[in-house]
A protein has these predicted regions:
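Short, contiguous alpha-helical
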Residues: 2, 11-76, 115-179, 184
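Helix-adjacent hinge/juxtasegments
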Residues: 69-109
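Short acidic-hydrophobic surface loop/beta-edge motif
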Residues: 110-114
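Residue-level preference for long, well-ordered alpha-helices that form the structural scaffold
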Residues: 6, 10-13, 83, 87
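General structural signal for secondary-structure boundaries
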Residues: 6, 31-33, 80-83, 103-107, ...
Length: 184
């Protein structure tokens, strides 16, 4: 296993993000459409609205990391997922783009993000730190909202240490990943 450096950390975080979303998505599949849309206590007051917010923001920042144009327009045109299944499929595709980016990432590279009145420029490592924080923050809200349903919230934080491979085996298999891809 390689020593921990920033590039390794970002690669591990991208994988952890995808695995957490996969676990969360599998739990969400047990909900009916009413539970997916039901009003709940949170900043975005439903599972659907919170998860669609995560996905829309992911698309924006991952697009910026990849140097894509038209990000503000794409964000404004974002079409929310009508079901947990649709969200899981689209989130997985987004997560795989992020994993691919982090596998080759230069944390010092500049990233441009168009805003209403300027273009924000930050290093890729800083953008990724912000993105991972955003995902974790809102995923925690989803976890809390899920606790108010008939579906038990899944474990999201006790399976990513290198010594915990036995806790993530099925999750890794769902992506076709091995330990070397995550930890080097």
């Amino acid at each position: 296993m390689n020593a921990m450096d920033l590039s390794s950390y970002l690669r591990i975080q991208a994988h952890a993000n995808a695995l957490s979303n996969q676990r969360l998505g599998q739990a969400l599949l047990a909900l009916d459409a009413d539970a997916w849309q039901a009003p709940r206590t949170s900043f975005f007051p439903s599972l659907a609205r919170t998860l669609n917010h995560i996905l829309a923001v992911d698309h924006y920042y991952i697009g910026a990391l990849h140097g894509e144009a038209g990000l503000r327009e794409a964000y404004a045109a974002f079409q929310p997922c009508a079901s947990a299944d649709a969200w899981l499929q689209r989130q997985r595709a987004s997560d795989l783009r992020l994993v691919a980016f982090c596998a080759q990432c230069d944390p010092e590279a500049w990233v441009e993000m168009p805003r209403a009145d300027h273009v924000q420029r930050d290093r890729a490592g800083h953008v990724l730190a912000h993105l991972f924080n955003h995902q974790t923050h809102h995923r925690g809200q989803v976890h809390a909202m899920l606790a108010g349903t008939a579906v038990a919230p899944p474990q999201l934080d006790e399976f990513m240490m290198p010594s915990e491979a036995h806790l993530r085996g099925p999750d890794m298999q769902a992506f076709g990943w091995d330990e070397a891809q995550v930890y080097g």
